[in-house]
From Swiss-Prot:
Basic and acidic residues composition bias: residue spans: 1122-1131
Name of the featured protein: Protein timeless homolog
Post-translational modification Phosphoserine, affected residues: 281, 1074, 1087, 1149, 1173
UniProt free text on domains: Residues 1182-1199 comprise a putative nuclear localization signal; nuclear localization is required for the regulation of period length of the circadian clock.
Family per similarity comment: Belongs to the timeless family.
């Protein structure tokens, strides 16, 4: 981008900064405002970073900002603004674009910005610029905390950020082309920092306890200073060349010389004796060309050994998603003076700053005061400075802050987190892999430092090492870490350097663990196992489980005399304490008003257990809590009537509520059913550690393949890396006797390349191991000819054992675990039992066989497989467990079902009697479906259990029958809560019908109380929603869950009211699913008819309260007649409204229309008079509400009449 392509305003702003004349910079009067304008322009740049690119192309930093910084730093406002602008201009390109762009156009902009940043870095490599920065920073640090202002802290932070940004710019290797020991741009920058004295200020900030707020900034700058350095090489600078280094260099030169000599010898052998034009062509017998003919070779015979069918072919392009990860970290040797400066800086940092700074940074990380991923700088510093300390002069006290079990735990925790995130966040897998590599390097250095402590002459240091190793080897997670990293190694995300460090760290860990086991004799370690245990449970009635089962009438009569005597004594005691007995559960989710039925059951349980005083006390307490309806007796009840009431409670067949585990079970699944639950239990135990058993965990193909992958680059690997590879493979092949794990064709190709390498003499250890494996293979191939085929596959331990010990050896070893064979007598008995039980309906054939099989114990699976082997069954699928498939109905069974239906169709519980008397036991849902299919019933509601009418008792107004009906009603209200959408349609349909069956009776008191609390408008809104949903479902023909969205504040408050939510549940409205939904929903299983009935049940006497003064007569005799007259009108109106909804749903019969159609007309005139006398506002409101209900013209009158009825 050229200067003349700049934006006009941007160009004018840059020109207004000033100009450079010689070495002097002359600033313009409005220089400060121009700098602020540039900051504003950068704040509003587009996604291509156009402003940044134009300023970079104009070299604004080199030509204007740096001269202003160095020559006009006394102008504090201008200096602050220039620092702000520089921090913005030098921020990393990745930070500007968010990530590395993939589109070519944005990638071009990214590279252009990076080029300008590299130019900025070169411009900053001057002592003068860093001298001004260090001088300003020094003056600011001289101020005490009470003198330092907020602007001073901001300037300190901006200077540190500017240094960080400049050091962060990556080097341009293609342009610099610097060799080792030559000064690169980064080296020049470090030398400028050293000459300006900024390094001393960094050491001061790191060591001062008063400057802890800059800890992370300092650590980030230090990590960028040593980015390309090797700590071990840096520690040996200035001490002369060690003998070990000289020998390593000599070995490397010897390898290069041998390869060069081999190439010369090969070229000499390739020269033919004859002239090339008389070479001729050759036919290679036994090697076919593309056709069926022999191959024709047109080159000299000395080139025949290099022939390949792939010659001349284009190599197959590897897809981008399958390419191996590239190495990003590059290590190089800086100039000698820079390395000496860095070595001294490291020494001072370790002695004065390391422990304090690392402790402060760790505190920031644990308290979450740092930014995201700042722990990577902590792990880099740990690995680098501990390695430097170990290589320079090992002093454990200098790194004591990070030399503890807690540090091991912190690194292991982050390493595991990065490993899991790399597997889940596939888009950022490469970034997570780099962080995981840093954590692995830190873990490796921790182990190396502990290993170095073992050979320390100080006894206290060796004891500390022993304690750390004891803790590390004891915990299972530390031992399993390397196995997990090997098994999930992915070369597409993790570079080869990660695999190298993983192999070296594993080698060090195994060496330390093996040595520790030998010195201890026996080592006890922690062991964690996830065990699955199966728990069987039966869906039983709670009363049967508790043992309090209501007895037969004869047994009740036998028990009653003893209870009556106790009750006579207790009833006379009017001072019987009721304080200690609470008839309801205050912690239950069920409201207190709905716990009356449960209180009745508790009274019966006390009587069955012989606890008469407790039963009487509970009865009196319940009377105090629930006085309405005189269910537990009236307030002035006599002792004799109390005893008779308790006798009725004892003999009443009270329905019992299911336990909390079975409360959500459907009514169709009331039959007993065994369910198996698999529970994972993590058991922590201790066991004696066996090193060979632990080593066997590495004997798998995934680990071996990772080692072989690294071995392929043996020429580029260091001698230590190759030693680590060979040592692990030798452990598997020799110590575990599993050399067959390496019997693989790609491994043998690698061995062939190694043995034919001219410099094979430098890899004596690798050559020896390759010859050992090849010798083992050929020895096995002489016995097992199939070993050549096995070369094509990677193998596990089971295949290895079969290869070496013979195929089928695993079956012989596991013969003791096999089930015993079947004798002819057992087979005959099995055949007999199967034929006897296979046609029995409602019975599991295999379970019946297991119950009558008196031979050797067998499992269900063994019996099923043997039945299939004997030909008695076609497949294992024929023996599914009970309830997994539908048994077909036979003709006789259908006739029996029709006969039972005709016999019990007039009873109160048709379905219950059929289920008790039918021969072939089936579930309730199957019987209902069959009755519908046969046409015996038209709808499911015809099979519902009919409510029994309350009969007056001769003793009390509420007798035993009323008690039974009352309890049954409350239990149905509690059990008929709407279930989730995932239930079956047949279950949801029957439950919805049960809800509608008790809507009017259960909602009467609840709706009245809601009206009294001021929820009239939300109730009308809910009524309209139900009717609209019913209309939509009739028009569309399909139904789906409809959310109830409260748009007004009143409706929203009502939806949060517990009593209003209770009404919604009773109407069948489903609450929002946890974490997935927000609003209540009208379920899809409710039909339009059911929705209209629910809407009709919501009408309450809202207007009747205003009309009540006009309806109250002055004469008592007239009052009774008017009340009877009003009740008659209300009943007639209710029947008319229900008929209107039935007609709309198509359910009304002509007889009903004739019977009901005449009666509302008689009641209409009087109601019309009442309505006409109402206020005009209420009349208009009624007219507006009538169309919403979708009724005929008299809908308004009907609703008022229904509200009057429910008010009574």
């Amino acid at each position: 981008m050229d200067l003349h392509m700049m934006n006009c305003e941007l160009l004018a702003t840059c020109s207004a900064l000033g100009y450079l004349e010689g070495d002097t910079y002359h600033k313009e009067p409005d220089c400060l405002e121009s700098v602020k304008d540039l900051i504003r322009y950068l704040r509003h740049e587009d996604e291509t970073r156009d402003v940044r690119q134009q300023l970079g192309a104009a070299q604004i930093l080199q030509s204007d900002l740096l001269p202003i910084l160095t020559q006009h730093h006394q102008d504090k406002p201008l200096f602050d603004a220039v620092i702000r602008l520089m921090v913005n201009l030098t921020q990393p390109a990745l930070l500007c674009f968010g990530n590395l762009p993939k589109e070519p156009s944005f990638r071009h902009h990214f590279l252009q910005v990076l080029t300008y940043l590299q130019a900025y870095k070169e411009a900053f490599a001057s002592e003068k610029a860093f001298g001004v920065l260090s001088e300003t920073l020094y003056e600011l640090l001289q101020l005490g905390w009470e003198e330092r202002q907020e602007e001073d802290n901001l300037l300190i932070e901006r200077i540190l950020l500017l240094v960080r940004n400049i050091l962060h710019v990556p080097a341009d290797l293609d342009q610099e082309k610097k060799i080792d020991d030559d000064a690169s741009a980064h080296d020049q920058l470090l030398w400028a920092i050293h000459l300006s004295g900024l390094d001393d200020l960094l050491l001061f900030l790191a060591s001062s306890s008063a400057e802890e707020q800059w800890s992370l900034h300092v650590l980030e700058i230090v990590s960028l200073m040593f980015r390309d350095q090797n700590p071990e090489q840096l520690a040996g600078v200035g001490q002369g060349r060690l003998a070990q280094e000289r020998s390593a260099d000599f070995a490397e030169l010897e390898v290069l010389r041998q390869r060069e000599m081999a190439e010369k010898k090969t070229r000499a052998l390739q020269r033919g004796n004859r002239h090339s034009r008389f070479g001729g062509s050759y036919i290679v017998q036994g090697l076919k060309s593309i056709g069926e003919r022999d191959l024709i070779f047109h080159k000299g015979l000395h080139n025949l050994r290099n022939y390949s069918s792939d010659l001349g072919k284009q190599p197959k392009k590897v897809p981008k998603r399958r390419q191996a990860a590239r190495e990003l970290s590059i290590q190089r040797r800086s100039a000698l003076n820079v390395r000496l400066f860095l070595r001294d800086f490291c020494s001072e940092f370790l002695e004065n700053c390391y422990n304090r700074l690392m402790g402060s940074v760790k505190d920031h990380l644990l308290r979450e005061k740092a930014q995201q991923h700042d722990e990577t700088y902590y792990m880099w510093a740990l690995a680098f400075f501990m390695a430097f300390n170990r290589a320079a002069s090992f002093r454990p006290g200098l790194v004591s802050e990070t030399l503890s079990v807690r540090t091991f735990h912190f690194i292991e925790q982050n390493l595991t987190n990065y490993y899991e995130m790399m597997l889940t966040d596939r888009k950022e897998a490469a970034s997570w892999a780099r962080r995981m590599h840093l954590a692995l390097k830190a873990y490796q250095e921790l182990l190396a430092t502990v290993n170095e402590m073992d050979i320390s002459p100080d006894e206290a240091v060796r004891e500390s090492s022993r304690i750390i190793k004891n803790n590390i080897f004891y915990v299972m997670e530390y031992r399993e870490l390397f196995l997990a990293l090997f098994r999930k190694f992915d070369e597409r995300c993790q570079p080869r350097s990660f695999l190298r460090d993983l192999v070296e760290t594993t080698h060090l860990f195994l060496k330390m663990l093996e040595r520790f086991c030998r010195s201890r004799g026996n080592l006890v370690v922690q062991n964690k196992q996830k065990k699955r245990r199966k728990k069987k449970k039966k869906v039983l009635d709670q009363a049967i489980v508790s043992g309090n089962v209501p007895s037969s009438p004869e047994e009740v009569e036998a028990v009653w005399p003893a209870l009556a005597e106790q009750l006579q004594c207790c009833a006379q005691n009017s001072e019987l304490s009721m304080d200690s007995v609470v008839p309801f559960d205050a912690a239950s989710e069920v409201p207190v008003e709905e716990q009356r039925a449960e209180a009745m059951v508790r009274i019966q349980d006390c009587l069955l257990a012989g606890q008469a005083p407790q039963a009487l006390t509970l009865l009196r307490s319940a009377r105090e809590v629930w006085p309405e309806g005189d269910v537990f007796g009236s307030q002035d009840i006599s002792p004799e009537e109390e005893i008779q009431l308790l006798k009725q409670i004892l003999s009443a067949p009270l329905p019992r509520q299911q336990g909390p585990e079975e409360r959500g079970a459907e009514e169709e699944e009331e039959e007993e059913e065994e369910e198996e639950e698999e529970l994972q239990v993590v058991q922590v135990s201790e066991k004696e550690f066996n090193f060979l058993d632990y080593l066997k965990r590495f004997a798998c193909s995934t680990v071996v393949r990772a080692y072989v992958l690294l071995l392929r680059s043996y020429q580029q690997n260091s001698a230590h890396t190759n030693h680590c590879i060979v040592k692990m493979l030798h452990r598997l092949a020799h110590d575990l006797k599993m050399e067959a794990l390496l019997f693989q064709l790609s491994v043998f190709c690698l061995f062939n390349r190694l043995l034919s390498d001219p410099a094979a003499g430098a890899y004596k250890e690798l050559v020896t191991f390759a010859k050992y494996i090849l010798g083992k293979f050929f020895a096995l191939a002489a016995v097992n000819q199939k070993a050549f085929v096995e070369l094509l596959f990677w193998k596990n331990t089971a295949v290895v054992r079969e290869m070496t010990e013979g195929y089928g050896s695993l079956d012989d070893r596991s013969s003791s675990r096999r089930a015993p064979t079947w004798s002819p007598e057992e087979e005959a008995h099995l055949r007999e039992l199967y034929l006897a039980n296979k046609d029995v309906e409602g019975q599991d054939v295999v379970e019946a066989i297991l119950a009558h099989l008196n031979t050797v114990p067998r499992t269900r699976k063994q019996i099923i497989h043997h039945l299939v082997q004997m030909g008695l069954a076609d497949s294992v699928k024929d023996f599914q467990r009970k309830g997994t498939h539908i048994v077909l109905w036979t003709g006789d069974q259908e006739l029996e079902l029709q006969r039972l239906f005709e016999e019990f169709r007039d009873s109160d519980d048709v379905l219950g009697h059929i289920m008790k008397n039918i021969t072939a036991k089936r579930s309730r849902a199957r019987i209902v479906d069959k009755l519908l299919a046969l046409g015996l019933v038209a709808e499911r509601r015809e099979l519902y259990k009919k409510r029994q009418k309350k009969l007056a008792s001769s003793i009390l107004p509420n007798g035993a029958e009323s008690l039974k009906d009352f309890c049954q009603e409350d239990l149905e209200e509690e059990e008929n809560l709407p279930e989730e959408d995932s239930e079956e349609e047949e279950e949801g349909g029957s439950e919805a019908e049960q809800v509608q069956g008790s809507l009017v009776l259960s909602n009467e008191n609840l709706g009245q109380s809601l009206h009294q609390e001021g929820f009239s408008i939300p109730l009308l809104w809910l009524q309209n929603c139900l009717i609209r949903a019913a209309d939509d479902r009739e028009e569309d023909g399909c139904s789906q869950a409809v959310p109830l969205v409260p748009l007004t504040e009143e409706n929203e408050e009502a939806m949060e009211n517990e009593q209003f939510q209770q009404l919604l549940r009773k109407l069948g409205v489903r609450p929002p699913a946890s974490g997935q939904e927000t609003f209540w929903r009208i379920p899809a299983k409710l039909s339009p008819t059911q929705l209209r009935r629910a809407a009709a049940s919501l009408s309450q006497p809202e207007e009747e309260q205003k009309l009540q003064p006009e309806l109250q007569p002055k004469v008592p005799g007239e009052q009774g007649s008017d009340e009877e007259h009003c009740k008659e009108h209300r009943a007639q109106a209710l029947r008319a409204l229900l008929l209107a909804h039935k007609k709309k749903a198509g359910l009304a019969s002509p007889e009903e229309e004739d019977a009901v159609g005449k009666e509302p007309l008689k009641a209409a005139p009087k109601k019309r008079q009442l309505l006409d006398s109402d206020e005009e506002q209420e009349e208009d409101e009624g007219r507006n509400r009538a169309p919403e209900l979708g009724a005929p013209g008299i809908q308004k009158k009907k609703r008022y009449q229904i509200e009057d009825d429910e008010d009574d």
